[in-house]
Regions:
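Glycine-centered hinge/linker elements that transmit conformational signals in sensory
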Residues: 229, 233-236, 268-321
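Short, solvent-exposed loop/beta-turn-alpha elements that line the ligand-binding surface or hinge
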Residues: 162-170, 224, 250, 274-297, ...
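C-terminal capping/gating helix-and-loop segments adjacent to ligand/active sites or protein-protein/ligand interfaces
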Residues: 412-492
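Short, well-ordered beta-strand elements
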Residues: 62-94, 110-114, 137, 257
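C-terminal motif of bacterial Sec signal peptides marking the signal peptidase cleavage site
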Residues: 16-20
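Periplasmic solute-binding protein
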Residues: 149-152, 173-219, 258-282, 376-384
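Extracytoplasmic/periplasmic substrate-recognition and gating elements
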Residues: 350-419
Length: 492
């Protein structure tokens, strides 16, 4: 018997034991006799939790196999994709995934399996066109999901009765974006860390910031609603230094930050609450930039902060995507005080020889209520149209069960152990992470059509040309066609 099967058997026995204990009769527990007088113990019943209010059915699935198709390690190395592991290996995240899956398997008498391929989206057409029933859930790169739906390969999530994506163990911010006209074509839940770890944050060198002797710490600026574009700019300019005194700012000098243009400037734009694609009152997407005075104010303010100031060093001038690896080296060499990275990328600085703090990207101004964290580039869950109807119930139950368990166990492991303890080096950064996790922001312009929206605006920052208005005019018809194609597919 394999270690996996032994674990499932032990967990199943424990679950049966707990159920037996829970149903044992205890007689008159609530009433006792004292001197001939009845004394009733006060009601100590706890308030029902969300889990209590929305229970899943108890069901013996008789070995049912929940089949995931996911990416192997040949691509998407920048995100955490793992949905199943064969055994524990001492890594806390690995072991949390293992324990979660074995608990769910034991509870429902089922199996959870994951087949890894180079690109699930690219290989989808062959087996779907032939009608093959190979997978229940296919994990897809967020940028590919609209195209796959428009080609008729994906089903709507309203076909899974028990996978209630409005519950807290699903990512409502993401699922609202992926729901159009009442139909949801992709979903994000706590069973996967892929999108969570793609939230972008701002790291800072605590020693370099401390040397400025600021009147208020960066953490307090976040708490006091003063971490704004103006606040960031006023601090960032102090780090620009011609280290070798040759009168030329280049790779030998010091800056506030550097990196991929799309990451730095995109995070600043999203941090101000700008959305490239919004929805109308009926849930239909619309291109949100044309005629949006606030969006243009944000674009131009960020442009003016950086134009000619050397706050940002454009280390790779070829395109908006490259520069992250070089930026990591600059930050470790103390040539930049700030560094933008995904939460997954925080792990790259375990060996840094200085203390690191973590911040959300700044707000537009103090009137902005919330922080917003750009989130894109991970995988989302999709349902193939080949999924037989008689599998829908079990698939929905098991997905929801995985999300519930992950909310209680996997996500806290990632937040508390992997991030707060292993990488973040102070309690203030741990508090910032709570703000960041609560501020993850999704946008069809970031996740589904970035090539036609988000990246186009980043070209202006790459070239440092203030042409946001002409860019909008140029891409308007393209974006509207993207939206029309997707909406038409949902109506079929």
């Amino acid at each position: 018997m394999t270690k996996r099967m032994i674990t499932i058997c032990v967990l199943a026995a424990m679950l049966l034991s707990c159920a037996s204990c829970g149903s044992t009769e205890t007689g008159n527990d609530e009433t006792t006799k004292s001197g001939g007088t009845d004394t009733t113990v006060g009601d100590t019943t706890a308030e029902p939790t969300e889990y209590d209010k929305y229970p899943l059915p108890e069901k013996d699935m008789d070995g049912f196999n929940l089949r995931f198709c996911n990416y192997d390690d040949s691509w998407l190395t920048w995100t955490i994709k793992t949905l199943d592991v064969e055994e524990e290996n001492g890594d806390k995240l690995n072991d949390a995934v293992y324990a979660r899956n074995r608990r769910v398997e034991a509870k429902y008498n089922c199996q959870i399996t994951e087949e890894l391929v180079a690109n699930p989206g690219n290989s989808m057409s062959g087996y779907i066109m032939s009608g093959d029933d190979l997978y229940d859930i296919i994990m897809v790169h967020d940028e590919a999901v609209s195209s796959l739906y428009c080609q008729g390969y994906l089903d709507s999530w309203d076909t899974l009765e028990f996978a209630d994506t409005s519950r807290s163990w699903w990512d409502n911010n993401a699922n609202e974006v992926f729901q159009i006209g009442g139909k949801q074509f992709a979903a994000v839940g706590d069973f996967t860390l892929s999108m969570v770890c793609r939230g972008f944050v701002m790291l800072f060198n605590k020693d370099m910031v401390s040397d400025l002797n600021l009147d208020e710490s960066l953490y307090d600026m976040v708490r006091d609603n003063k971490w704004t574009l103006d606040g960031y700019a006023s601090i960032a300019k102090n780090f620009v230094k011609d280290l070798n005194g040759d009168g030329t700012m280049d790779g030998n000098d010091q800056y506030a930050t550097t990196g991929a243009v799309k990451l730095h400037f995109g995070s600043l734009v999203t941090g101000c609450g700008v959305k490239y694609i919004s929805t109308d009152s009926e849930g239909v997407p619309q291109f949100a930039i044309p005629g949006n005075t606030y969006a243009f104010d944000v674009f131009e303010k960020i442009f003016n902060i950086h134009n000619g100031t050397n706050i940002f060093y454009n280390i790779v001038k070829a395109d908006v995507h490259d520069g992250s690896n070089e930026a990591t080296t600059f930050f470790k060499n103390k040539q930049t005080a700030f560094h933008g990275t995904s939460m997954r990328g925080v792990a790259n600085f375990r060996d840094a020889n200085f203390d690191i703090g973590i911040l959300p990207y700044p707000k537009y101004d103090e009137n902005q209520e919330n922080y917003y964290i750009l989130t894109s580039g991970g995988t989302v869950a999709t349902i193939p149209v080949t999924l037989p109807e008689d599998r829908h119930e079990n698939v929905g139950i098991l997905l929801d069960a995985l999300c519930r368990d992950s909310q209680q166990n996997l996500l806290p492991t990632y937040k508390e152990i992997v991030l707060k303890t292993k990488y973040a080096r102070d309690e203030d950064s741990a508090e910032m992470l709570d703000i960041i996790f609560g501020s993850l922001t999704y946008d069809l312009g970031l996740s589904v059509w970035p090539q036609d929206t988000y990246y186009k605006y980043m070209e202006s920052y790459l070239k440092m040309t203030d042409n946001f208005s002409s860019t909008t005019d140029k891409i308007k018809s393209i974006v509207e066609k993207d939206i029309s194609d997707l909406v038409s597919s949902l109506d079929k």
